[in-house]
Amino acid sequence: MTAKRIIQTIRQNDPAIRSNREAWLYPGLWAMIFHRWANKLYRSGCFFLARLISQWARRRTGIEIHPGAEIGHGLFIDHGAGVVIGETCIIGDNVLIYHGVTLGGTGKDEGKRHPTVESGVVIGAGATILGDIKIGTNAKIGADALVLTDIPAYSTIVGEPARNTRLEASLRSEIAALKVRVEALEKSLNQLNSISPKNMSS
């Protein structure tokens, strides 16, 4: 992702910015520029130099992105302080990450051990997402949420442990519909019970 594209992303996501020059003051811009270089080196096998760049970028920006992480277009890291993105993370396009977010592993497993974040996801400040799990397209992860399992697309997740508020709303509506049906059945049963045997035989 070019610096021009990163600046466009910042301007699209942050109403506080007033000019393209101001975008160069954003730590998220520099974190992405350095990651682009580090990722190229990492993929070419220059692991030490790639890590050197990523660690230098962490000191300069407060954002730690492992050079092995695969990041799509349009990632916006707002504020940025304390963001950690692990080695095997895969991040889609147009993802928004706020400060204090961790996309980490759950142990010493090898191979794919970090989250996959699909396009359009928003991750609130302080959220922790751990393990080889998938965050579905356009899902929203609330601030300080702890996520340890796959999250369906278009879900809204809050709390620790994380709860799917969209799913809860769906369950509430289903329960309400069942309640109406039960009340209708009870009314029908009461009507049947009120009919005397004499009336039934006639």
Regions inferred by a protein language model and the residue ranges of each:
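Terminal amphipathic alpha-helical/low-complexity segments used for targeting or macromolecular assembly
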Residues: M1-T61, L171-S202
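Structural signal for interior beta-strand "rungs" in well-ordered beta-sheet cores
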Residues: R58-T165
